[in-house]
Amino acid sequence: MRESLTRDLGFSKEDREKNIERITFVAKLLSRNGVGCICSFISPYQSIRDNVRANTTNFLEVFVDAPLDVVIERDVKGMYKKALAGEIPNFTGISDPFEAPENPDIHVRTDKQTVAESAAYIIGELEKRGLIPVAEPA
């Protein structure tokens, strides 16, 4: 999304709100036309998440959680390195706050679970809620 629909936006709170608003608009448009949507993005403010929840249907908040040091270690784009050097202002977790979700529907700890374990847990939760069909054993 950052390379297309939201390329004009930075990392200020206002720009992050616009980013989420645009993504939500597209997801709602797709959903109205029978397309299921899974949106993955950094949403650092509880108020923004609450707004999306209030204005969409079948919304599930999945908190993919890891301590900041682990996130920095995993940063393949070097964004955190730039933010720590002061090259990117208003960067989540560095020079701008991250408000952890108060009550996420699904919570995975990727510093304690493997990618496969985290994915299996999320899929299992979606199956339990009837949002995706239960996978047949192989």
Model segments located where?
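Flexible, glycine- and charge-enriched loops at secondary-structure boundaries
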Residues: 12-20, 112
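Conserved amphipathic alpha-helical interaction elements at protein-protein interfaces in regulatory
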Residues: 29-32, 128, 132
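Conserved alpha-helical scaffold flanking the Walker A/P-loop in AAA+ ATPase domains
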Residues: 19-29, 95
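Small-molecule kinase domains that catalyze NTP-dependent phosphoryl transfer to phosphate-bearing small molecules
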Residues: 65-68, 72-120, 129-138
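Hydrophobic "lid"/C-terminal helical patch
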Residues: 27, 122, 126
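ATP-dependent NMP and nucleoside kinases share a basic, alpha-helical "lid"
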Residues: 2-15, 27-84, 90
